[in-house]
Regions:
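Bacterial N-terminal signal peptides that target proteins for export
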Residues: 1-12
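Hydrophobic core
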Residues: 13-21
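Short, low-complexity N-terminal intrinsically disordered segments enriched in polar/charged residues
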Residues: 20-49, 54-55, 72
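Hydrophobic alpha-helical core bundles mediating ligand binding, dimerization, or RNAP-core interactions
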Residues: 37, 56, 75, 108, ...
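A short gly/proline-enriched turn/hairpin at secondary-structure junctions
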Residues: 55-68
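Surface-exposed, charged secondary-structure patches
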Residues: 77-119
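Short beta-strand edge/turn micro-motifs at domain boundaries
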Residues: 101-103, 121-153
């Protein structure tokens, strides 16, 4: 039963990612940023922490006081607790500043199979990601997030 739910969530996620990419003609930086989000979602689904952390700038800092190493540790704990992960991403807005910086506003539904009583956990969060272009790569320099309906910080 749970496997069926996970397959359904993954299918919905692929559809949403595909539809997100079909928002009309996008600029080259916008296409790169959408690809960056898709790559991050795929790395999370595969529990590839190394790939995710490589997408974060060495100088990352956020309002919660986290640095890159703190985000790495958050990912480590989440990936250890979840046997399987499914993400549903919806990009609401991408703002690009001089092709060298960007802000992405998005909602992410997260589901994971784990050893809890129900065997499944699910949450939905809003994210504001700030990115900077370093050479040809986009790097996350800061982020704010919060559960849907709650204040982001």
């Amino acid at each position: 039963m749970i496997s069926k739910v996970m397959r359904t969530l993954c299918t919905i996620g692929v559809v949403i990612l595909t539809l997100t990419a079909c928002g009309g003609p996008a600029s080259a930086p916008e296409e790169q940023l959408r690809a960056w989000v898709a790559a991050g979602a795929e790395a999370a689904k595969d529990k590839n922490r190394r790939e995710l952390v490589s997408m974060i700038s060495e100088s990352y800092a956020d309002a919660r006081g986290n640095e890159r190493s703190d985000i790495d540790n958050l990912l480590r704990v989440y990936f250890l607790r979840q046997q399987k992960i499914a993400l549903l991403t919806s990009i609401e807005d991408i703002t690009i500043y001089d092709d060298t910086a960007a802000k992405i506003e998005m909602t992410v539904g997260m589901a994971g199979m784990n050893d809890s009583v129900l065997g499944l956990s699910a949450d939905a969060y809003r994210f504001e990601l700030e990115l900077e272009r370093d050479a040809d790569e986009w790097q996350l320099i800061s982020a704010r997030w919060g559960e849907l309906g709650e204040e982001m910080r």
